[in-house]
UniProtKB/Swiss-Prot annotation:
UniProt KW keywords: Cell membrane, Iron, Membrane, Metal-binding, Monooxygenase, Oxidoreductase, Ubiquinone biosynthesis
Co-factor note (free text): Binds 2 iron ions per subunit.
Protein name: 3-demethoxyubiquinol 3-hydroxylase
Pathway where this protein functions: Cofactor biosynthesis; ubiquinone biosynthesis
InterPro entries, alphabetized: COQ7_proteobact (IPR047809), Ferritin-like (IPR012347), Ferritin-like_SF (IPR009078), Ubq_synth_Coq7 (IPR011566)
Pfam families: COQ7
Organism: Xanthomonas campestris pv. campestris (strain ATCC 33913 / DSM 3586 / NCPPB 528 / LMG 568 / P 25)
Length: 217
């Protein structure tokens, strides 16, 4: 992910260029992971065509989830009022960059591709993050908690439905699940607001729509 020195982040144009570069890196680039791929030397077992297609669909969903997480966190960080909250969000975003890279690697191994709608997923998530952040840092952190808890739940579902022999995908998802739980815990400790009931339900509905589309496209 392209880094721009803090000393340059003075003008609105500087900040706009930073956000544009982040969007391009996330959606069209191939940002490198800072940590090793959890799949490591795990053997890539042979999968039947239907199994490979299913595994690719699930990993495409997970890749989209990371695109959305990047958009959400960068949108929140752009309007965060507290430096500690901003740094918390950017640190979480860096770990999500690792997830993004790992999922992209696995999609290539499965001879598949990311979602065609990644620009839309990113833009929508960035807008949601900015709106949440404008309500206040406690609201912003509340969205982090709810997002990560919902991601944990769908990672559990994927670990149950992935082909048993697809140990490379499983290794990646297990580490992602640990990271997501930690992000949620840290956000709670930082003062996250509990979101009112309609919001988590709306987020779950949007997530279901995204997963349905991303599985195939």
């Amino acid at each position: 992910m392209t880094q721009i020195p803090p000393s340059r982040l003075h003008s609105p144009l500087d900040r706009l260029l930073v956000e544009a570069q982040r969007a391009l890196d996330t959606v069209f680039g191939n940002p490198p992971a800072e940590r090793p791929n959890p799949a490591g030397d795990t053997p890539d077992a042979a999968l039947a065509p239907a199994q490979r297609q299913h595994a690719a669909g699930l990993m495409r969903i997970n890749h989209v989830g990371e695109v959305c997480a990047q958009g959400l966190y960068f949108g929140q960080a752009a309007v965060a009022r507290d430096d500690h909250t901003r740094q918390h969000l950017l640190t979480a975003a860096q770990e999500e960059t690792d997830h993004l890279a790992w999922c992209a690697d696995r999609l290539r191994e499965l001879e598949s591709r990311p979602s065609l709608f990644n620009p839309l997923w990113y833009a929508g998530s960035y807008a949601l993050g900015a709106v949440a952040g404008l309500r206040g840092d406690d609201w912003s952190l509340g969205f982090v908690v709810e997002t990560e808890r919902q991601v944990e739940a769908h990672l559990d579902e994927h670990l149950e439905t992935l082909p048993e022999t697809d140990q490379r995908s499983r290794a990646i998802l297990r580490v992602m699940k640990i990271d997501e739980a930690r992000h949620a815990d840290h956000a709670e400790q930082a003062g996250a607001r509990i979101l009112p009931p309609p919001i988590p339900s709306a987020m779950a509905l949007a997530s279901k729509l995204m997963k349905t589309i991303a599985y195939r496209f």
